[in-house]
């Protein structure tokens, strides 16, 4: 993997973080359309809604997380290290990150179609509930399986 100096410094910063420091991170989710990287997924422009759900239940009820590994050592031996380090840095700086997207796959299983690493990272740092973007037609499934509650747009 080719790393620039900024990536190396960021990984080194994360490598030095204690478990207590990691657990004190508060995720900041972008629900304001102006702050989203992919605003096309905002309820204003899509058939999606934001819901707050239990992260453990989200992971348990999503079938496509088998290859997502979070190794807190930041030792350069795992391919998604930069994704985790960049998300940690953004959250430390109180910068918004798009919520994960929960969908149903072609074989009718539930998946996280975007934001798998953000989801696993949130669980690792001890977050109980996260915000997810789901299609309106999965609202009842989310309420039942994920203990989800719809966020009211302000």
Residue ranges, per PLM feature:
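A short, basic-hydrophobic beta/loop patch
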Residues: 94-149
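Solvent-exposed functional surfaces
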Residues: 7-35, 127-129, 141-154
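Short alpha-helix boundary/capping and kink motifs at helix termini
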Residues: 1-16, 20, 25, 41-111
